[in-house]
Amino acid sequence: MRLYKAMALCLPLVVICTSEVSQSTAETMKSKAQDSYKRVVEHGKTCLERMCGLLSRGKGMLYTRVKNIVSSIRRGGEKNEEVAGPVDGEGSEEEAFDLSPEDIEKLIEEIKKKLAGYMDVTGEQNEEEEKKEL
């Protein structure tokens, strides 16, 4: 009976001590998890900022290339006495990207013609060379 009374008195004390240890352990683990989470979030923000910077630079480079190609085609059209639009090449970004499907096809054909002297773009040159060799 004395053992039972001693157990009855000690059990709440053991439960309290155990819960306090668990609580402090839980707080420690929580703070470690929060620190890790904060580091991951900061790393994610840094990566996102870098990615946005790269995309912005890529957009600028693409805009410049399209603008140069369009102005080159317009200059080539002038040489052939074809009027393709203003020659100054000072169009806005919206102008450069506001092309109809027909304009895009024309651009692709012009680019293929310009590159034909440097490399085989369409595969037609190799066929013609093979026919000449036979």
Curated annotation (Swiss-Prot):
Keyword terms: Signal
Record organism: Encephalitozoon cuniculi (strain GB-M1)
Residue segments, region Disordered: 77-98
Superkingdom of this protein's organism: Eukaryota
Name of the protein this chain belongs to: Uncharacterized protein ECU01_0440
Signal peptide as annotated in the record: 1-26
